[in-house]
């Protein structure tokens, strides 16, 4: 095969920036001209765009995706004595947020094909939890790698148990479940605008989506130090968590490009599938789901060998995530489902994420797939 058509990037922010650089420069210059760097007009404009994109009644931006999780849990008065169910196979923020509030993360296993929370494991965890004296309050439904979880099955279970659903859409913003956009699922949804996310800014940022009037009012107060109707009358303990105006201005322009980029990501994923699906375990989408394709992740019994081969050919790859949360030093003290988290543990040994972005060239995908297949 010929040489790579370009240096392979795991995530190519430069290619995107080149497409809209003039628009970004103008948007940033406008903020510099008006000088409202905190909660300027672009923040409200971007929140309006997010509401339109998701169909949520409210969209409230904040400083980052982790704060978004914390703000929702704070609005729901989650704290000591409360159990928050979290998949063991995910990024730490999903468990960090409840733990910081004094609640107990309760770890649940995931489905092998989707990497998302397993409703059967969740049902067992709720039963286990009730025996401990903890109060089951919330399930954090993480949409890992871009695909929404089985929200209907989880919703049926959660409703029957009186448990709220917090969708962690940090990786799935732009995806859909049965035609419903991420942002309109669960009691509340959060997302992250970290630069590497499908919709990312050039710093940190996050957002919360809800259709509950009361939750929206409380979250708006919490993100601004717990302020009341008067600026210096703080009616609750809050935090300082705001999306700055420059990032909002950037995100307004990037959101305009986002639908096209989602389509390009889906095309790139389909090309990978056509090259690899007969050779190894590729990502499987649930029926009537679309993915934001934050990552393209294989399950490979000899993962380390293949990653080494890719590295030797200057092809980047990443393991998301090498240690289940329930096994990590800071979190193994917390309870996990009695049936165990065996799928999470095995996936941590076998997953490998390949380069994925909207501007990935087919020639490079062919070379990457060839390296994977030759080293199986």
Question: Which residues make up each language-model segment?
Answer:
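N-terminal "arm"/small-domain region of PLP-dependent enzymes with the aminotransferase-like
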Residues: 1-36, 41
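PLP-dependent aminotransferase class I/II
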Residues: 2-3, 14, 26, 43-48, ...
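Pyridoxal 5′-phosphate
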Residues: 19, 78, 136, 265
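Phosphate-binding glycine-rich loop
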Residues: 35-83, 97-99, 107-109, 131, ...
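Short beta->alpha connector loops at strand-helix junctions that form conserved
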Residues: 88, 107-111, 321
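Structured binding elements
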Residues: 102
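Active-site phosphate-binding strand-loop segment of PLP-dependent enzymes
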Residues: 113-201, 207-209, 353
């Amino acid at each position: 095969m010929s040489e790579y058509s370009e240096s392979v990037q795991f995530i190519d922010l430069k290619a995107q920036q080149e497409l809209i650089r003039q628009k970004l420069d103008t948007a940033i210059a406008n903020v510099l001209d008006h000088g409202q760097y905190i909660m300027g007009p672009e923040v409200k404009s971007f929140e309006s765009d997010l509401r339109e994109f998701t169909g949520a009644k409210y969209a409230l931006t904040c400083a980052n995706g982790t704060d978004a999780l914390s703000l929702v849990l704070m609005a729901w008065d989650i704290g000591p004595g409360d159990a928050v169910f979290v998949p063991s196979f995910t990024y730490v923020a999903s468990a960090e947020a409840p733990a910081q509030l004094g609640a107990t993360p309760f770890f649940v296993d995931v489905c092998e094909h989707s990497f998302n929370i397993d409703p059967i494991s969740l049902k067992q965890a709720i039963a286990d939890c009730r025996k401990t004296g903890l109060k089951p309050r919330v399930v954090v439904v993480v949409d890992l790698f871009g695909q929404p979880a089985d929200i209907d099955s989880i919703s049926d279970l959660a409703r029957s148990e009186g448990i709220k659903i917090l969708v962690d859409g940090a990786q799935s913003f732009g995806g859909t479940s049965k035609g419903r956009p991420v942002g309109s699922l669960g009691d509340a949804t959060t997302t992250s605008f970290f630069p590497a996310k499908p919709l990312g800014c050039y710093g940190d940022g996050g957002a919360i989506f809800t259709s509950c009037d009361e939750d929206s009012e409380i979250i708006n107060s919490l993100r601004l130090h717990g302020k009341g109707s008067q600026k210096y009358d703080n009616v609750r303990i809050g935090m300082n968590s705001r999306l700055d105006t420059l990032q909002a201005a950037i995100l307004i322009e990037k959101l305009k490009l986002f639908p096209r980029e989602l389509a390009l990501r889906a095309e790139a994923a389909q090309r990978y599938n056509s090259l690899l699906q007969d050779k190894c375990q590729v990502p499987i989408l649930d029926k009537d789901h679309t993915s934001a394709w934050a990552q393209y992740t294989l399950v490979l019994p000899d993962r380390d060998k293949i990653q080494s081969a890719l590295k030797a050919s200057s092809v980047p790859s990443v393991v998301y995530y090498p240690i289940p949360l329930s096994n990590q030093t800071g979190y193994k003290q917390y309870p996990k489902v009695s049936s165990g988290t065996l799928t999470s543990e095995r996936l941590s040994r076998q997953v490998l994420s390949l380069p994925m972005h909207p501007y990935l060239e087919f020639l490079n995908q062919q070379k990457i797939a060839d390296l994977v297949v030759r080293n199986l």
